[in-house]
Amino acid sequence: MMKTLSSLLLLFSVSLQAAPIERVISLAPHATEIAYAAGLGDKLIAVSEMSDYPEAAKKLEKVSNYKGINLEKIITLKPDLILAWPAGNPAKELEKLEQFGFKIYYSQTKSLKDIGDNIEQLSQYSDDPQIGLNNARDYRTHLEALRAKYQNLPKTRYFYQLSDTPIITVAGQNWPTEVFRFCGGENVFDGASAPYPQVSIEQVILKRPQAMFVSPHAIQNNGMWSPWVEEIPALKNAHFWQLNSDWLNRPTPRTLLAIEQVCEHFASIEQKR
């Protein structure tokens, strides 16, 4: 493979940065959604395997997945711009793409603000930048409206479960922590050293969360928490909810839907107090 890549490098070593942006590849589902919001949908030629929104993205060629990036395919497609996800795409493979001279936009989406910024920044590559500028503006306006609506929610200790075997959660500033924090949530595993730590049922019991959230695909065993109803306040008080994982786990304009979903659940707890 290295010999093939070396040959291709000789063919495409000229920098592409000066070329007009007509062919775009996205290496992450959230970057694909943001590209469409920025007005780049007509320029997308390939995306990641899990890029399933909007519907048009499903028809595009697939060049990456959780295992890595198909470098040879990307090189033969000759993109003018690659949308990469530094937190999810292999750094070494991104470095190789840089060495080939490809223009790469790194989608940094660690905060709610970053979503609007990404849309606005990518709009410059659209034939009609106003599409992205309008969508970025609408996103920010809606975000501020939600902030005004839910800013007085009390603090609620929560646990968010990403998977069940093993049990994985989120810690620190890692996505989607800010969505929960926006709604007054306090992560019971906020201080964990790993960004997405593996935890045990016993640890969750000791943390005594007031609310528990899962993604639909996270629970293969629907009864895994049943024996602990009396031990965990969230379960005892029926504060256990499934969330739309695409809305929540992908930092895109649809995150606004996740915010409303989470905030409404926290608000329902307050109504019972």
From Swiss-Prot:
One of its GO terms (molecular function) is cobalamin binding. InterPro entries: ABC_Transporter_SBP, ABC_transptr_periplasmic_BD, ABC_transptr_vit_B12-bd, Vit_B12_bind_prot. Its main location: periplasm. Disulfide bonds join 183-263. The record marks 72, 202 as: Important for BtuC binding. Pfam families: Peripla_BP_2. Residues 1-18 form the signal peptide. Keywords: Disulfide bond, Periplasm, Signal, Transport. GO terms for biological process: cobalamin transport. Coiled coil: none annotated. Residues 23-273 form the Fe/B12 periplasmic-binding domain. One of its GO terms (cellular component) is periplasmic space. It is found in: Periplasm. The complex is composed of two ATP-binding proteins (BtuD), two transmembrane proteins (BtuC) and a solute-binding protein (BtuF). Part of the ABC transporter complex BtuCDF involved in vitamin B12 import. Binds vitamin B12 and delivers it to the periplasmic surface of BtuC. Belongs to the BtuF family. This is Vitamin B12-binding protein.
